[in-house]
Amino acid sequence: MVGSHKASGVLLVLLVVMATTIANGTPVVDKAKNAATAVEDTAKNAATAVGGAAASVGAKVSGAKPGAAVDVKASGAKGDSKTDDSAAFAAAWKEACAAGSTITVPKGEYMVESLEFKGPCKGPVTLELNGNFKAPATVKTTKPHAGWIDFENIADFTLNGNKAIFDGQGSLAWKANDCAKTGKCNSLPINIRFTGLTNSKINSITSTNSKLFHMNILNCKNITLSDIGIDAPPESLNTDGIHIGRSNGVNLIGAKIKTGDDCVSIGDGTENLIVENVECGPGHGISIGSLGRYPNEQPVKGVTVRKCLIKNTDNGVRIKTWPGSPPGIASNILFEDITMDNVSLPVLIDQEYCPYGHCKAGVPSQVKLSDVTIKGIKGTSATKVAVKLMCSKGVPCTNIALSDINLVHNGKEGPAVSACSNIKPILSGKLVPAACTEVAKPGP
């Protein structure tokens, strides 16, 4: 079509030139050549423009637009609670990670053997969930600290759960758990692992019946978890709700946790952590530690736990370190505005923590605790000892402040008491029970 327009144009120009030449006496051949060249260049430019437009349209038709959402069902997922959808999720992640886009998960129950969502990715990635996940019920040992579902080395990641449930089906695993005999508790999968995430958000997900820990946050920086649910019965052994370690700038804002171990456990290398508006119970409370079990542990610094409700748990807020430990540090810690409801040992520092007898009993812990503030703690204690501060003989606690504590016990043993060892706390405000009226001893 361009060719026919080109020929018509050339003929028209030649006629005009010839007429002008006859009138002005200018050589016809030179004028005609110049006119023909101009028309040909115009035609080439037009053809190039048309061809470029066609190529662009072809690219859009033949390939997915960068950043477009990837539907996991388009990648082959069934969501029928029976088919293993692991391969479909892997394919969807590969596509979304390469483009920096969103994965959408429609309603359904997705059975997955295991999943690995690994970066780095080309750009920010969002996982938008409207379905639930279910693990196999069978018990399989894994490499230490492995996860059922892993998110690893991703920046600017968002997980919008929309109340999605990750069901680890752990009841058979709890029966097979032999931690009490061996002290080895890491051969079962963690429900969800977040490793090496930066500038990321985890919103509105629930982990149920994990075979081991529910969530593990390791080597992360600047991530926020909100509207988190953890649900497992009290008999689920070693099912810490959310464990945080070797991470900086983690914010846990809003969680309801019921489990068989610590609701929140804070491991070595944790810095600048905020835990806020957490409801905990049943479980073992909110704990820093245990620390000092392994060599080369990193300091814990800048931990704030505030505005929490702890109910029907074995402990409230506590710091626990192993006797006979290598040197370590935990400092700049704040427990504030926390309500206890029928909690055993609501406030506890235990530097002789020795579960299952796997420790060097009688050898002082070398983890130094300092600059700890325990403020605004109120409610009821299920045990007569409501505050127990048992620090290390080797490196006694320093700058431990107690302020505005009101914990009551209505049992047959009498009113609540406070027991201390190797510590001279800084006291302020009203303290019930009165501080350090008894000597702290190992044991519950």
From Swiss-Prot:
Its main location: secreted. It is found in: Secreted; Secreted, Cell wall. One of its GO terms (biological process) is cell wall organization. It catalyses: [(1->4)-alpha-D-galacturonosyl](n) + H2O = alpha-D-galacturonate + [(1->4)-alpha-D-galacturonosyl](n-1). One of its GO terms (molecular function) is polygalacturonase activity. SMART domains: PbH1 (SM00710). Disulfide bonds join 263-280, 391-397, 420-436. May function in depolymerizing pectin during pollen development, germination, and tube growth. Acts as an exo-polygalacturonase. This is Exopolygalacturonase clone GBGA483.
